[in-house]
Each structure stands twice: as C-alpha cells, then as structure tokens.
Amino acid sequence: MNLRLFAAAAALSIASRGSGAPVLAPAAQLASALQHFISVPTGRIALTHARVIDGTGAAPLEDATILIDGPKITAVEGASAAIPPAYRIIDLKGASVLPGIVGMHNHMFYIARPNIDASGHFEDPLVVPQMTFSAPRLYLANGVTTMRTTGSVEPYADLNVKSEIDSGTMVGPHMDVTGPYLEGSGSYFIQMHQITSPDDARRTVAFWADQGATSFKAYMNITRAELKAAIDEAHRRHFKITGHLCSVTYPEAAELGIDDLEHGFFVNTQLDPGKQPDKCSEGQGIPTLV
C-alpha cells in the first residue's frame, strides 16, 4: 500500500471494525505536515470496477462498486450499482481492495546487539532501541491499519505515539498499546523491569492500565504466582493478557487463565523432561523479542 493512500485505508479499516471510534482524525483535522500523505480526501467517493476481498473467506467479488461517505463504507455492490450524484468516481479496474490488516503481534522497536563480537557472541544486557518515527509509517505503508504492540520496551513512547496518531499529528495505524513486558528475574534486556513478587506483578499491571495500556504480555522468566497475579489484575480491569513464555508451560498458563500465547511450539517447554518449575529449560528462552 502506498503511504499516500492511508486515509482511504483508514476508512476501510473503520468499515471492518464496525461503528467504533475512527482510526484516524478526519482529513480536515490532520496537521498540515501530514496533508501531503493524502491523495484522496474523505468525502463521497465511489470506487468502481474493483476486486473486493472482504476477509471472511468468501470468494472475491469481481467488478464491484464501493460507496464511501466520509469515514464509512455505505455499500459494496456489483458493477450495475447506481452511483448517487455528487460522488467522486475512482476507477480501480485491475486493482484489489481489502479491509485494513489487523496486526496481532507488532512492535515499535528494532533489536540491536551493540556488544556483539566478531564470533557472534554477546554479553548482557541487550539494548532495544525504539522506532517511534519510522515504525508507524512502515506498518501503515504495508496495509496495517490496526496494530497490537504485544510487549513494549518503552511504553510511554508507545502511548504518546498512539495519542499523536489519534489526534491527527502523526502518521500511523490505530494502536492497541500493550504495557511493558511482565518479565521475571533474569532478563536479558536492560530496559525491562524485573518483577520480584506477585504483588509487584499486580501493581505493574494496575499502574500501566491507569496510564492507558489496553493489554498486557507476560515474558520468559515470570513465575506462575506472578503470572496469576498479573492475569487476575488484567481481567479485573477487563483487559486481556498474552505471553511469550518458557518458565511457565502452556498448560500451566492456560490453567491460570491466560488469554493467548505467542510464537507456538518453539518456545513451549512442557515436553522437556528436565524442565524445572518456574524456570526456562536449557536452550529455551533465547531472547528473540518477536
């Protein structure tokens, strides 16, 4: 997706999400520095002769007409659809239209290992620099109109970026900001708070929920007791919690009430016969931050 089409992409994302809050501020309210990204302002627009992929699994609708009125798609019909007066017509013959992509596992940082040596070895701690300027643009340019940060190393930066995007002063997708990684003792990453007790886990979730985080992610070295406290506090506030886990097995996390698990079986430790309670297995928990 060309970044200059982000206003249209936002409209498609709004349609896919129903009648919730707009992804972006209306074009007329965007900061002047962002106006050059818009090739087609919002208004009454008819997209004709498009192939529509609606994301439901249904076959694509060929030669379709899409009617857009302001921030909402009002109709998706066949080629014979009547186009109301005063609609701007854009011919999309040969092009495909689909709802904005909802990214379920995204980050606003890029991993770097400044202390790596010539043989590829590195010493703790790792440093993870934030990409507050380029990451939102790159996501949007590739069609991601809604993203979940799924673990943050600089949660205030993520929350402030979300605020700038929502107010129309910065380019980027709608953001579900996950709080800081809920990591236990022994983290590789210097930017992570290391939780020391169930009460610490509860207080961490409560604090960041009050700051504006809307979901949470447990990380590799958290204990079962700490994870349970974090889950209970998140659920008390009607938020969900996921995990990139190795100290806690998947069955243990499911029993504790976790809502989601990231990365599949390559970080799952339940089948390791040498697995110790609340500890990552040998060779597991290698820092990937993916």
PLM regions with names:
Residues 218-290:
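Active-site core of metal-dependent hydrolases
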Residues 7-17:
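Bacterial N-terminal signal peptides
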Residues 18-20, 27:
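Boundary at the C-terminal end of the N-terminal hydrophobic targeting segment
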Residues 110-128, 171, 179, 183-188, ...:
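Active-site gating loops and adjacent loop-to-helix segments of metal-dependent hydrolytic enzymes
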Residues 30-31, 37-39, 43, 52, ...:
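Histidine-rich, glycine-flanked metal-binding segment
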Residues 134-155, 174-180, 210-222, 240-242, ...:
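Divalent metal-dependent hydrolysis catalytic cores, especially in the metallo-beta-lactamase
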Residues 1-7:
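Bacterial N-terminal signal peptides that target proteins for export
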